[in-house]
């Protein structure tokens, strides 16, 4: 029997400051957004592995001491990132055109305390976004968009070198439909995403490595309908085919781990508009997940699962506390036990058990 464990302590600060406004140039209206964001993150990680004596599954004897437990990793990761971004959303007649850009400056360091080594990486990058949409008289709005992405990581490879940031590009085409005089919205989209330098590892004790490229292709469908002033129904479905496009020969063309092939959800909510319970919101929904592969060679497919969630919210404005609201979220209401994902045939992970989260917010 094997054992692996890890610990992490993280401190972080993040700031995002933005300014938006509107200006006209002739017949074109410009909705402008400009901003600066900053994050400074530091985390300390430790990793252990070990071995325990065998156990008889039919006549188990508990309480055995480990043969050994070894500290194999003790690292400090630091990441500092500053981003400057600008977006112009233009409106002319029935056309909508969006252009955006972002410039990032990133500094990353990985300090290996076990081997007394350090690796640093400094990068600058420009990301872009463009989208085009046309509004027809009948409520149909086709659109096309393209964007690039840049995500730094503080993970290091087997030689202690910080991995290159993940880069990606996405094409998306779709159509939105809002029936005239109705209270419903429908959308359908197809997309393709290509990502490079994806950080991954097979076993918990393995070092990280970069996958050359992963390609995702999929379809997304969504429907939102206000059945009445109080009742709202939302349903969605996503089909995704994610494969290793540039990787090791064994993985080439295989489906990626962690990625469901099919996901579907439905959510029904009810708002109390009058009476003693005015301001109360009740909601419940289901999530279905199917087609997660067991490993990078696609040996097996994990069993599908369905989860039930619930929410109770209360807008305290109805009792004179303007802007104040409280909410209780329950995820995995039935406390279903299921396998959510696998790194390999040797390491799989159960999904999150029932969780109950309460929150209070104040808008002013």
Positions of the model-derived regions?
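Surface-exposed loop/turn segments flanking beta-strands in extracellular/periplasmic regions
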Residues: 1, 45-74, 119, 200-201, ...
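Residues that define the transmembrane beta-barrel architecture of outer-membrane proteins
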Residues: 9-13, 78-82, 122-126, 167-171, ...
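Structural signature of Gram-negative outer-membrane beta-barrels, strongest in the C-terminal barrel
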Residues: 10, 25-33, 37-40, 75-195, ...
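Residues on the lipid-exposed face of transmembrane beta-strands in outer-membrane beta-barrel proteins
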Residues: 15-21, 84-90, 130-134, 173-177, ...
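Conserved C-terminal beta-signal and adjacent last beta-strands/turns
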Residues: 31-32, 171, 257-364
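Outer-membrane beta-barrel translocator domains and adjoining extracellular loop/strand segments
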Residues: 44-51, 109-117, 153-161, 197-206, ...
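Gram-negative outer-membrane beta-barrel transporters
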Residues: 94, 192, 210-295
């Amino acid at each position: 029997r094997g054992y692996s464990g890890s610990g992490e302590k993280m401190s972080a600060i993040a700031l995002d400051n933005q300014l938006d406004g509107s200006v006209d140039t002739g017949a074109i209206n410009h909705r402008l957004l400009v901003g600066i964001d900053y994050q400074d993150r530091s985390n300390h990680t430790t990793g252990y592995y070990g071995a325990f004596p065998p156990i008889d599954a039919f006549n188990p004897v508990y309480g055995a001491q480990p043969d050994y437990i070894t500290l194999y990793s003790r690292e400090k990761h630091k990441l500092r990132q500053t981003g400057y971004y600008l977006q112009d959303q233009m409106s002319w007649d029935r056309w909508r055109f969006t252009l955006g850009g972002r410039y990032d400056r990133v500094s990353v360091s990985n300090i290996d305390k076990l081997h007394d080594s350090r690796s640093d990486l400094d990068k600058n990058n420009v990301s872009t976004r463009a989208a085009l949409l046309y509004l027809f008289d009948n409520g149909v709005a086709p659109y096309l968009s393209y964007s690039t992405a840049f995500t730094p990581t503080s993970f290091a490879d087997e030689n202690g070198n910080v991995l290159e940031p993940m880069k990606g590009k996405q094409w998306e085409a779709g159509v939105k439909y809002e029936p005239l005089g109705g209270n419903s919205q429908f959308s359908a989209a197809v997309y393709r995403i290509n990502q490079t330098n994806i950080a991954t590892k097979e076993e918990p004790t393995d070092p990280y490595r970069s996958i050359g490229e992963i390609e995702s292709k999929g379809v997304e469908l969504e429907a939102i309908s206000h059945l009445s002033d109080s009742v709202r129904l939302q349903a969605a479905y996503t089909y995704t085919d994610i494969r290793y496009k540039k990787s090791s020969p064994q993985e080439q063309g295989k489906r990626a781990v962690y990625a469901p092939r099919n996901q579907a959800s439905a959510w029904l909510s009810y708002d109390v508009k009058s009476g003693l319970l005015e301001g109360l919101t009740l909601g419940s929904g289901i999530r279905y997940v199917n087609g997660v592969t067991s490993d990078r060679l696609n040996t097996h497919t994990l069993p599908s699962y369905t989860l039930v969630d619930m929410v109770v919210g209360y807008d305290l404005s109805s009792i004179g506390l303007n802007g104040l609201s409280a909410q209780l979220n329950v995820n995995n209401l039935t406390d279903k036990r299921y396998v959510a994902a696998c790194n390999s045939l040797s390491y799989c992970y159960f999904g999150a058990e029932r969780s109950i989260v309460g929150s209070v917010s104040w808008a002013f």
